[in-house]
Each structure stands twice: as structure tokens, then as C-alpha cells.
């Protein structure tokens, strides 16, 4: 059995009870899951109307997902239509304050995002799970730059925005601005000290995910 400390934040497999005691305490273990993210913005009439979000799960977690959902039992790295139909959208039943991690702004205004709908599920490379979901976007428009971040506030899942950044319907250049990791860990240490240290953080991990968040800025012509 492969064990991992799983949370229901992404409605993912629940092996935590079976694996208790095999993992370090929460502060030293965070994050548990690593996801490379990409975006496809849909622009109509100068405003963003939808966004497709790609999540590529790390190799270990992909293995856990495949075992838990019974995916690819023949090990050919290709999911059948039945496997996709039964599993598509598994990571969209969000809970515990997690709302998909995506935050978008135009200038100072935060854009409103609709509920997610699943688009695709596949295996890539040597068996990594990749999913895509789509969300409607309410964008007031204007000349402000569009920016996006993806992060888990509790830093259980570590997102990196290193996937493809595509804009459909406008000529835009995406710029990836990486998080300052040294500053982020300094902020994490300060936040943990403020609540009484690592022991207190085991059941009350501080919401520091934004400190570790990459940012993508979309500079669009016209």
C-alpha cells in the first residue's frame, strides 16, 4: 500500500487513517501534494469570459490517485473512455475553505469566477495525472492588466504556475513572476511563532499559501 497524508480539500483519496504515524508533523510535512498549473484565458470583446485550468499532479500523488481510482490497470498509460467517464471531475468537489485556488484580478478589481466544470482527464509522460477544468469569468474590462495566482491558503497543496499560459481571442504576453521562497519561509516561521510554534500548528496550520504563490501577468495589446 502506498501511504500519503490526504485531505478532502480536493475531494481526493482518504488514506490518512491508515497511514497515521508514518509521516512527519504537519508543519514539517507541508506541502503534501505538488501540482504544476497552466491557464487558458478566453477573451471576447476585450474581456475575459472564461478560463481553463490545467493541473498536472506529481508522480507520487498520481500513483496514489491511479491506485485509489483503479485507473490504468493494464499499465499502458492510456485511460479508457469508461475510466475517464467514471473519474472525470474527481478533484472538483472542493471543501474546507478551498475554492479551487485560482485568484484573478484586473488592476485592483478581483474577477468573479464561476463554478468549475470538468473538461478532461488523462495520463501524460510516465503516468502523471493531468486534469483540466473550466470556469466562467466575470470581468469588468478596462485597461488594467490581468493577473492570476493559484494557491492553497493552507499550503497543503503546492501549486507552481509553470504550465502553458495561453490566451484565446487576444494578443497577450504572459509573464511568470516566481514567489520569493526565502521570504515565504520567513513569513511561515513568523506565522507559526505567532500561534505557538510547530506543535500548535499541527492542528491549526497558518494560512500562508499566498506567500508561496507564483503570479502570472498578462500584458495584452490594444
Residue ranges and their predicted role:
Residues 32-34, 95-96, 114, 211:
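Short solvent-exposed loop/turn micro-motifs enriched in small/polar/acidic residues
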Residues 107-222:
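Mature, soluble, non-transmembrane domains
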Amino acid at each position: 500500500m502506498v501511504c500519503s497524508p490526504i485531505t478532502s480539500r480536493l475531494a481526493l483519496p482518504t488514506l490518512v487513517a491508515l497511514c497515521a504515524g508514518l509521516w512527519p508533523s504537519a508543519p514539517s510535512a507541508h506541502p503534501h501534494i505538488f501540482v504544476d498549473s497552466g491557464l487558458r484565458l478566453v477573451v471576447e470583446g476585450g474581456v475575459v469570459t472564461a478560463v481553463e485550468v490545467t493541473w498536472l499532479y506529481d508522480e507520487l500523488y498520481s500513483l496514489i490517485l491511479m491506485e485509489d481510482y483503479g485507473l490504468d490497470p493494464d499499465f499502458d498509460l492510456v485511460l479508457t473512455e469508461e475510466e475517464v467517464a467514471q473519474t472525470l471531475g474527481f478533484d472538483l468537489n472542493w471543501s474546507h475553505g478551498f475554492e479551487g485556488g485560482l485568484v484573478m484580478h484586473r488592476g485592483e478589481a478581483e474577477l468573479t469566477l464561476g463554478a468549475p466544470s470538468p473538461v478532461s482527464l488523462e495520463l501524460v509522460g510516465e503516468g502523471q495525472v493531468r486534469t483540466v477544468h473550466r470556469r466562467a469569468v466575470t470581468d469588468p474590462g478596462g485597461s488594467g492588466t490581468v493577473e492570476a495566482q493559484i494557491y492553497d491558503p493552507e499550503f497543503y497543496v503546492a501549486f507552481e504556475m509553470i504550465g502553458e499560459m495561453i490566451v484565446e481571442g487576444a494578443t497577450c504576453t504572459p509573464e511568470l513572476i516566481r514567489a520569493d521562497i526565502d521570504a515565504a519561509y520567513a513569513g511561515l516561521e513568523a506565522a507559526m511563532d505567532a500561534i505557538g510554534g510547530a506543535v500548535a500548528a499541527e492542528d491549526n496550520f497558518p494560512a500562508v499559501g499566498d506567500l508561496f504563490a507564483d503570479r502570472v501577468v498578462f500584458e495584452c495589446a490594444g
